[in-house]
Design a protein with these regions (language model features):
Chain A
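N-terminal glycine-rich FAD/FM-binding segment characteristic of electron-transfer flavoproteins
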Residues: 2-268
């Protein structure tokens, strides 16, 4: 069931939902019970696949546009520039203190408000946010926008206003079709995201970068942040104890060490 | 508690994880209803009753034949509104995650995902949730009803209690946008050859292999160890290896004596398919790869350097054990 090659998305407007996540050393702050976002931030790696797919669909069609939409703290712009450097045209960031601590209900609401304003033909999502591993956002957003939805897409084509996606489930592969405008979440196998070129990096700074507050969007404060959230965190605990794990650096004797270990564990 | 459990089914069988969640719900309270949505699904009601449902709602309609989420959101939302269930539970799959998240938006209802336990504490429902690659366990709850929860793959075993249930057909009214996505084709796996589920040793490869041709490295090591070859979704989706060899949430669940993970980051969705392995060995060049959190032996290094040598050493050991002539 090979899918025919991409036809250009003539004049298509594509919105890519991109989340900015902590680069390393992830921890939950015991005070706020939220993810500690104080360290270095980076573009959610799974969202680079969505950006790449958008750029592929856009091709060299000057009439098409790729806009990044993100909800997060103001300083997320630094990390989002990576996606601009890859080739996205502009970014709209919803940054508002009152949105901190938003759960799925609250964040999908705010995202849907921006996306409604943007009115894209195609809304792309990454496979999952690598801090929360939700892999659910698209379904909430699609419901709010009353648009068709295809998730986990590993291969996609657009032709004659219809998007066709191939995706894996627990039982094998599905091919699903939906007319534009449509919300689509891509798998991390859909493509190999490009590295930004030096020219791209230089050019990124000059691309339009808009920051909106919740009130700019007409989102009432009680629909955002903790007030707008319907889930809560009670306590943060240790994982159950598990057997000892050993980690060694390969200094050229990795193979020998593995064999020793396997013999020790009687696994050889 | 009045709980609704969404039951997924495939080829005339209710899914094992769905039944496991049903059993858990029955253990938490006695008023447990089940929703089965599909086309020609009447026959499944009795099975739901045997595994803990005291009431079964059937949404039986040709428009629900394809396993697509949005029509199921419509049906579930109507049912939940009508009966005021305070809790709605799902065994997590590709389909149910989309149904649950769609419902969260539709009903303005909290959704906690990836739960591995549910308990009642002073009348309050509390979910246990591993987070950040399972390095912390968080107790989570809901601020309002209905409370929606997705239970991690493979968490609860079904319990056959042998009960009976009242069965009620529900009206199927779909939103315009819910029927825009259509199933064009479904290719289900034909199983051929021995299944990796029975293998005693598994050598698995991920995107770190660098290309499909490098699966040869894995195959040689697997041969030396007398094992089978497995793969991650990333490489199966990319067409490097067949789906029948995939381990994880949407692939096989395996528990061999030895699992060797090569160039695999160790995502939760992979872990749920192989965490039951007796001994796990991983080679990954990234010292921060999540796989190192649960590998019994983790080697930080380049698999291209280590694996050929490892295969050679294992072959030499085999030859020493079974000398020729
Ligand atoms: C450890 C942890 C656990 C959490 N558990 C829950 C929970 O059980 N229930 C709950 O309601 N909330 C939870 N949250 C909060 C939740 O992550 C945020 O509300 C987030 O905005 C929603 O992301 P998601 O996890 O649904 O993303 P996913 O569904 O994993 O993200 C899928 C895609 O949606 C897009 N996307 C996601 N977030 C954004 C964003 N902020 N801006 C732009 N695009 C975005 C990206 O394309 C991304 O690839 C948790 C957060 C953390 C850190
Ligand atoms: C609903 C859903 C269901 C899913 N189901 C499954 C499933 O059933 N099974 C599954 O596997 N995944 C599943 N996934 C996908 C999962 O989240 C990960 O994206 C996937 O497992 C990653 O595969 P990978 O480890 O091969 O690739 P990556 O995450 O890209 O990891 C590659 C690793 O190779 C390492 N590496 C690179 N080069 C070398 C080298 N030379 N030597 C050593 N190491 C190297 C890198 O450091 C990296 O850690 C699912 C996701 C979702 C959202």
């Amino acid at each position: 069931m090979d899918i025919p090659p991409i036809e250009s998305g003539a004049g298509m407007k594509i919105a890519v939902c991109a989340k900015v996540v902590p680069e390393q050393a992830r921890r939950i702050d015991p005070e706020t019970k939220r993810l500690d976002r104080s360290g270095e931030q980076t573009l959610n790696p799974f969202d680079a696949n969505a950006v790449e797919e958008a750029l592929r669909l856009k091709g060299d069609d000057a009439g098409a546009e790729v806009v990044l939409v993100s909800l997060g703290p103001e300083r997320s712009l630094d990390a989002l520039r990576k996606a601009l450097a890859m080739g996205a045209d502009r970014v709209v960031l919803v940054a508002d203190e009152a949105a901190a601590g938003s759960d799925l209900v609250a964040s999908s609401y705010a995202l849907a408000q921006v996306l409604e304003r943007e009115g894209a033909d195609l809304i792309l999502f990454g496979q999952q946010a690598n801090d929360s591993d939700g892999a659910v956002m698209w379904a909430a957003v699609a419901d709010r926008l009353r648009r068709p939805l295809i998730s986990q897409v590993a291969e996609l084509t657009v032709s004659d206003g219809t998007l066709r996606g191939k995706r894996q489930t627990e039982f094998g592969y599905d091919v699903i079709e939906a007319p534009l405008p449509v919300a689509v979440a891509v798998s991390d196998a859909i493509n190999e995201p490009r590295y930004p070129s030096l020219k791209g990096i230089m050019g990124a700074k000059k691309k339009p970068q808009q920051t909106l507050s919740l009130s700019d969007l007409g989102v009432d404060a009680d629909r955002a942040g903790e007030a707008g959230s319907r889930t809560e965190v009670y306590a943060i605990g240790e994982p159950p104890p598990r057997g000892e794990t050993q980690r060694i650096d390969d200094d050229g004797t990795g193979a020998e060490k593995i064999v020793e270990f396997l013999l020790e564990r009687k696994a050889l | 508690m009045s709980t609704l459990v969404f039951l997924e089914h495939h080829e005339g069988e209710l899914q094992k994880d769905s039944l496991g969640v049903l059993g858990k719900a029955a253990q938490l309270g006695d008023d447990v209803s089940a929703l089965i949505a599909g086309s020609g699904v009447e026959g499944l009601a009795a099975q739901a009753a045997r595994f803990g449902a005291s009431k079964v709602y059937l949404a039986d309609d040709p428009a629900l034949a394809a396993p697509l989420p949005q029509p199921r959101v419509d049906v579930a939302a109507d049912l939940i509104r009508r009966h005021g269930f305070d809790t709605v539970l799902f065994g997590a799959t590709v389909l149910t995650a989309d149904v649950a998240a769609g419902l969260a938006a539709r009903l303005d209802a909290g959704l906690n995902w990836d739960l591995v336990e549910l308990t009642q504490e002073n009348g309050k429902l509390v979910g246990k949730r591993p987070a950040l690659d399972d390095t912390v366990y968080v107790d989570v709850g809901w601020k309002s009803e209905p409370r929606l929860a997705l239970i991690r793959t493979g968490t609860f075993e079904p319990v056959e209690s042998g009960g009976e249930a009242g069965v009620e057909q529900v009206d199927v009214q779909l939103q315009d946008f819910s029927t825009l996505a259509t199933m064009v084709e479904q290719a289900h796996e034909e199983s051929e050859g021995p299944s990796i589920e029975e293998a005693d040793v598994i050598v698995a490869g991920g995107r770190g292999l660098g290309g499909p041709e490098n699966f040869a490295l894995i195959e040689e090591l697997a041969k030396a160890l007398g094992g089978a070859v497995a793969a991650t979704r990333a490489v199966v989706d990319a067409g490097w290896y067949p789906y029948s060899a995939q381990v994880g949430q949407t692939g096989k669940t395996v528990s061999p004596r030895l699992y060797v993970a090569l160039g695999i980051s160790g995502a939760i969705q992979h872990k749920v398919g192989m965490q039951g392995s007796n001994v796990i060995v991983a080679i990954n060049k990234d010292p921060n790869a999540p796989i190192f959190e649960y590998a019994d032996l983790g080697v930080v290094g380049d698999l291209h350097q280590i694996v050929p040598k490892l295969t050679e050493l294992v072959n030499a050991k085999n030859a020493a054990h079974f000398p020729r002539g």
